[in-house]
Amino acid sequence: LESLYASRKYFTRFNEEEKILPKQLATAQNRAENMLELLLQNGATNIRTHCNVDPIIGLGNLEATLAALETYKNRVSSRIVAFPQHGLLRSNSVQLVKDAMRMGAHLVGGVDPATVDNDIEKSLHTIMDIAVEFNADVDIHLHDANNLGTFTMKRLASLTEEAGWQGRVTISHALGLGGVTDKEAEEVAERLANVNIDITSTVPIGKQVIPIPLLDKKGVKVSLGNDSITDHWSPFGTGDMLQKANRLAERFGWSDERSLGKALRFITGGKETLNNEGKRVWPNVGDEASFVLTNATCAAEAVARQTEKRLVVYKGNIVVGILNEVELNNLV
């Protein structure tokens, strides 16, 4: 019933987009650039964006996204997912996704092979076939609840192994893991870890939250991300990853200094400033100079208080903020 309710919500949004998308296309690049500016102001140095590919406006959004990212190429790194929002099979978008890959998208996307595409096997096989054809990574949005969701994850794991695509597949949301028994969640986590499938979560409020501590313990790479950022799907997104780390820590009761500090690695691609022995492990000479300076005494304070971001540096260049001489002397 939960998956049925969710799918009805999605189909309602799809119907809305049939009217909205053509009207918004003329301003797509401008809105994309505004979004990039927001993300940079919030400290982003690397972005993975899911770009709608659909039969309503074809590759119009992708064209606008590519143009916007070209404008910002010296300020942030980026990768684009060719995302068939209305269903790869449901909207007959297979050829569009292939065309998107040829145009410059980097990853093959998909959404809910069961409730949206209504054919788990065909949907997953098609996604993986496109990925292999274009030698591209995969990022699938999987909202399906409970055992339906975990069944889909296990099938994806098998296909990942068959294709030799270990380490190249991401499941966004993976909500099914939040509605199964601990035993089932452990088994799925172990299977995902075995084929190096990673998970991205928005740590949603009001839904069954996936067991991120369990996934982390089992060796599944977990990262945090934003879903909607003030669009017709939801008005609550901010684009602030530090806020996501804060929510993660609060949700799972990570309130001591060490746990709070470790929450930061879920938004830094796994980078930590200190190891378990308290030794500094980042930054080191030779590391890429892409980072954020924030007004905090330590990583734990930054997560707990969501401290002000003062400076964003990308590949050695300041892209947001100004560092004056007094502040520079205090850093040395």
Task: State what each model feature region is.
Residues L1-H50, I56-T71, L96-R102, D129:
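Alpha-helical scaffold segments that flank or form the walls of functional sites
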Residues G43, V108, H141, I171, ...:
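Divalent metal-coordination and catalytic microenvironments
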Residues R79-S91, R102-I210, K221, T230:
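Active-site core of metal-dependent hydrolases
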Residues L159-V169, P213-A296:
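His/Asp/Glu-enriched, well-ordered alpha-helical/loop segment
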Residues E37, K98, D129, A189-E190, ...:
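Alpha-helical segments flanking ligand/cofactor-binding loops in enzyme cores
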Residues L1-A28, T152-T170, V188, T238-S255:
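Active-site gating loops and adjacent loop-to-helix segments of metal-dependent hydrolytic enzymes
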Residues P283-V332:
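C-terminal cap of metal-dependent C-N hydrolases
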Residues T65-A67, V97-K98, T126-M128, L156-L159, ...:
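Short, hinge-like loop/turn segments at secondary-structure boundaries
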